[in-house]
């Protein structure tokens, strides 16, 4: 017989109780999402809400992100100083993620100490918190973007000591050498085009910070045993993306039938546009198969110019405006798109949503918002 707590139970019952507890713990996981109110973060929150019964903790200081009251379809069940709980399993903490990570590093029971919330263990970590804001931010305030270095360093410092089950680190297509993305030298970028032993120059401080994050991920995996996946998403877009990004901004202007239609630069510069639903699909699949810090591309593998995007939206809107180039505006590299062969071979994954279908969804959302 086995003595457990104040009860004497048989080995069979002990096994049954232990198995039940184990199954409950395995089923009821807790996931952490930093930057959980930003574009990608909130889409991950909504996906996990819809497809799992896990407890979800998402952190955002709302400097750029949108409060979950405006986009989360869930009942508010509790709230306190600095946090809100929805449906008894989605916990939103309004805070600077740097402060939270510093608190975690010094106190393993930080959530209880700070918020009086009992969080036994964090299983998956989705680290989306970053200083972002599109091309104008990357070129216009590069030192602010460099703060991403501090955010990522503190996150990996905590993760290497806490060791969650899995972690996802979002790098960026901006980490690729800019000399591979010129007018004459543009190529479909392969994962192997980034080589830490033979470095090219990434895109501004944002690219450098993401490249450094990838390096930290490799160190975390090899030296500390952290199971980490890195992604290099290209130009993600979606219906609820902020208007500071080109796709929703172009859609909104097409919905208003702007004519002449202004475009930054010549409009011939191109990107690899991929819908947010496809991005989330690929992230979740990659986390099941990649744990050593290897970085993968997420894109369509197709170069589409901004002039072509304007044409798609205006065709949907049913008019043909005159295009007006704004040559004094920042445009970044000329051409950035990816080679998806590694992902197709390693994960068997391809994006499902075509440019035409994705842009139609964005346009319809823009029309709905303008009503």
Segments predicted by a language model, with ranges:
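C-terminal substrate-binding subdomain of Rossmann-fold SDR/epimerase-dehydratase oxidoreductases
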Residues: 30, 44, 76-91, 95-96, ...
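Structural element of the ATP-grasp superfamily
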Residues: 155, 217, 250, 343-344
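A short beta-to-alpha transition loop/helix N-cap that caps and shapes the active-site region
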Residues: 65-67, 177-179, 239-241, 306, ...
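N-terminal Rossmann-like NAD(P)+-binding domain of SDR-like oxidoreductases, especially those catalyzing
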Residues: 16, 21-236, 365
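NAD(P)-dependent short-chain dehydrogenase/reductase
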Residues: 179-190, 211, 215-287, 301-303, ...
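Intrinsically disordered, low-complexity proline-rich regions
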Residues: 4-18
């Amino acid at each position: 017989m086995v003595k457990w707590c104040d009860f004497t139970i048989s080995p069979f019952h002990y096994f049954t109780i232990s198995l039940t507890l184990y199954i409950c713990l395995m089923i009821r996981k807790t996931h952490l999402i930093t930057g959980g109110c930003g574009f990608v973060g909130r889409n991950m929150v909504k996906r996990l809400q819809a497809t799992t019964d896990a407890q979800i903790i998402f952190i955002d200081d709302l400097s750029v992100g949108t409060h979950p009251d405006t986009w989360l379809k869930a009942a508010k069940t509790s709230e306190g100083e600095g946090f809100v709980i929805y449906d008894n399993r989605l916990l939103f903490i309004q805070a600077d993620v740097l402060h939270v990570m510093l608190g975690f590093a010094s106190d393993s029971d930080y959530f209880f100490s700070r918020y009086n919330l009992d969080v036994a263990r964090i299983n998956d970590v989705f680290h989306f918190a970053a200083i972002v804001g599109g091309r104008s931010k990357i070129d216009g305030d590069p030192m602010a973007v460099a703060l991403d270095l501090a955010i990522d360093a503190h996150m990996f410092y905590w993760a290497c000591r806490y060791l969650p089950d899995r972690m996802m680190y979002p790098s960026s297509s901006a980490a690729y050498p800019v000399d591979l993305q010129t007018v004459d030298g543009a190529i479909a970028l392969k994962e192997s085009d980034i080589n830490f032993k033979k470095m090219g120059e990434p895109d501004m401080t944002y690219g450098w910070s993401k490249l450094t994050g990838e390096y930290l991920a490799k160190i975390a995996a090899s030296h500390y045993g952290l199971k980490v996946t890195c992604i290099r998403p290209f130009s993600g877009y979606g219906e609820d993306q902020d208007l500071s990004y080109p796709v929703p901004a172009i859609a909104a202007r097409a919905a208003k039938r702007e004519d002449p239609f202004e475009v930054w630069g010549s409009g011939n510069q191109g990107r690899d546009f991929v819908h947010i639903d496809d991005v989330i699909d690929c992230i979740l699949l990659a986390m099941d198969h990649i744990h050593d810090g290897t970085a993968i591309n997420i894109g369509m593998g197709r170069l589409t110019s901004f002039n072509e995007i304007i044409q798609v939206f205006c065709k949907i809107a049913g008019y043909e405006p005159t295009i007006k180039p704004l040559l004094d505006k920042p445009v970044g590299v000329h051409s950035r798109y990816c080679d998806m062969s590694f992902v197709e071979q390693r994960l068997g994954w391809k994006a499902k949503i075509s440019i035409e279908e994705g842009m139609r969804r964005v346009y319809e959302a823009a029309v709905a918002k303008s009503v």
